[in-house]
Design a protein with these regions (language model features):
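Hydrophobic alpha-helical segments, especially transmembrane helices
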Residues: 12-14, 123
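Bacterial N-terminal signal peptides
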Residues: 17-32
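Feature for soluble, non-membrane regions of globular proteins
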Residues: 36-240
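N-terminal secretory signal peptides that target proteins for export/translocation
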Residues: 1-12
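Mature extracytoplasmic/luminal segments of secretory-pathway proteins
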Residues: 6, 32-33
Length: 240
């Protein structure tokens, strides 16, 4: 008899415990069909999956630099953006759209900065390729038409990187039917100025300081001569 009463007591505790957990989940918006939150928009920006190993860019970018750059700085921007997106209708949008929709909102400056920095970094990872590549076909024709030669374009990329005061980015962009080299400060991006980015070089100090200290020019030249992914740049040209 006592065993039966004990079992009834345990069942009763389990029932009330389950009921209490369910009430708390509903109250906090963490309970819903298929595990989905009913408390508002919910999404998580995921890190870009690199197509190469983090040591594959050595000796021009060390594994240690890349691990800090990708795992700390870039991941930090994503984490902060996800934190700021919590409960926002913007959380369901892709990263690029979040960046565009917050670019001119004074009350969303922090979200823009982190989303744009995450987007810029992902574009930078794609702009790099172990061993680099060579521009061909339509891209090479546009380079020659816009700059005269590939060497002239490379010099302009280096000049723009060195001319950027403080943190920022150097870009190869398409504006209308012409290629241009531009620079942007902090989290700014050519997409916000009606231009089509083709590739970029990160000139924030965290991108190179462990390897090159204050020698930004050496870092940029190493990328231009050995790591630029011209295939990626060509793929970003609008299809005619």
């Amino acid at each position: 008899m006592r065993r039966r009463e004990h079992r009834h007591c345990l069942r009763g505790r389990a029932f009330w415990g389950t009921l209490l957990v369910s009430v708390l989940m509903v109250a906090t918006g963490t309970f819903g069909l298929s595990g989905c939150s009913q408390g508002g928009a919910s999404s998580t920006l995921q890190p870009y999956a690199l197509p190469y190993d983090q040591k594959a860019l050595e000796p021009f970018i060390s594994q240690k630099t890349f691990e800090f750059h990708y795992g700390k700085h870039y991941q930090g921007y994503l984490d902060k953006a996800n934190e700021l997106l919590r409960g926002s209708s913007l959380a369901q949008l892709p990263l690029e759209e979040i960046m565009k929709q917050t670019a001119t909102s004074p009350d969303k400056v922090a979200l823009f900065n982190n989303a744009a920095q995450a987007w810029n970094h992902e574009f930078f990872w794609k702009s790099l390729k172990p061993g680099g590549s060579k521009p061909e076909g339509e891209l090479l024709k546009k380079i020659q038409a816009s700059f005269g030669s590939l060497d002239s374009l490379k010099r302009l990329l280096l000049d723009a990187s060195l001319a950027q005061f403080g943190s920022g980015w150097a870009w190869l962009v398409l504006e209308g039917d012409t290629l241009k080299v531009v620079k942007t400060g902090n989290a700014d991006n050519p997409l916000l100025h009606g231009q089509v980015p083709l590739l970029t070089i990160d000139v924030w100090e965290h991108a190179y300081y462990l390897d090159y200290q204050n020698r930004r020019g050496d870092y940029v030249k190493a990328i231009i001569d050995n790591l630029l992914n011209w295939d990626f740049a060509a793929a970003n040209l609008p299809k005619s």
